[in-house]
């Protein structure tokens, strides 16, 4: 196996859910493409890396300083849904039910993997909560909206597994002194599962019956 081939396989194998065998198949498939198409693919990856960053408020993927969700005045500013990853945010958006804002933690507490609270975007979340209590802007840099005096609700939508449960419990504890309403998705999601794989109907019910 050539060094170039091996190196390319190693990069694809770094992708979540892609093992060495799958990575090898992908590279073999790419080698079957016309060179012009491979060049277009590589340019697309470069454009992605240079043109996509993280939203300054919620850490969703965005081509601008703020993502489309945070920039949308029609979203409910008094609700912030906490998710572990951008893919979880995408799954919730697909339901079409939730119309609030988000906060992407960047993972879940997992001491075994070296992910501690300080490894996540928890400080940024607390700052958003503080800013909301002061001026009702949910931590954004925009001006307060006239008449917006609703109570802030933090929806803990971490994955229904050990790491997600640990993270949700930790967040509940540190948010208590801030006197904000917190809610959890209703039971019904399979234990040990991941939000990004839950079907839309189940996710809709979990949101409707949150407590």
Give residue ranges: language-model regions.
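Extended, structured, electrostatic nucleic-acid-contact surfaces
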Residues: 1-16
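Signal for well-folded cores of large energy- and translation-related assemblies
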Residues: 13, 31, 46, 59, ...
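Extended interfacial segments that mediate partner engagement and assembly in macromolecular machines
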Residues: 23, 72-133, 150-158
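Short, charged low-complexity linear segments at domain edges
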Residues: 25-56
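Long C-terminal interaction/binding lobes of large macromolecular proteins
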Residues: 34, 98-99, 126-132, 151-211
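Cys/His-rich short segments
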Residues: 44-89
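Short Gly/Ser/Thr- and charged-rich N-terminal loops/segments
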Residues: 140-149
């Amino acid at each position: 196996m050539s060094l170039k081939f091996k190196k390319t396989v190693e990069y694809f194998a770094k992708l979540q859910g892609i093992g060495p065998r799958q990575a090898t198949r992908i590279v073999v498939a790419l080698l079957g493409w016309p060179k012009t198409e491979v060049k277009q693919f590589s340019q697309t990856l470069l454009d992605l890396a240079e043109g996509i960053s993280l939203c300054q408020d919620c850490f969703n993927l965005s081509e601008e300083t703020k993502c489309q969700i945070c920039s949308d005045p029609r979203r409910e500013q008094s609700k912030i849904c906490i998710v572990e990853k951008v893919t979880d945010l995408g799954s919730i958006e697909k339901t079409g039910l939730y119309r609030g804002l988000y906060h992407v933690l960047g993972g879940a507490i997992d001491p075994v993997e070296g992910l501690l609270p300080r490894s996540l975007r928890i400080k940024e979340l607390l700052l958003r909560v503080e800013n909301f209590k002061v001026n009702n802007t949910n931590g954004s840099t925009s001006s307060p909206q006239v008449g917006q005096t609703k109570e802030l609700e933090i929806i803990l939508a971490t994955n229904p597994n050990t790491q997600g449960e640990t993270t949700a419990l930790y967040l509940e504890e540190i948010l208590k002194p801030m006197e904000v309403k917190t809610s959890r998705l209703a039971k019904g999601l399979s234990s040990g599962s991941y939000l990004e794989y839950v079907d839309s109907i189940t996710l809709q019910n979990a949101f409707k019956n949150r407590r």
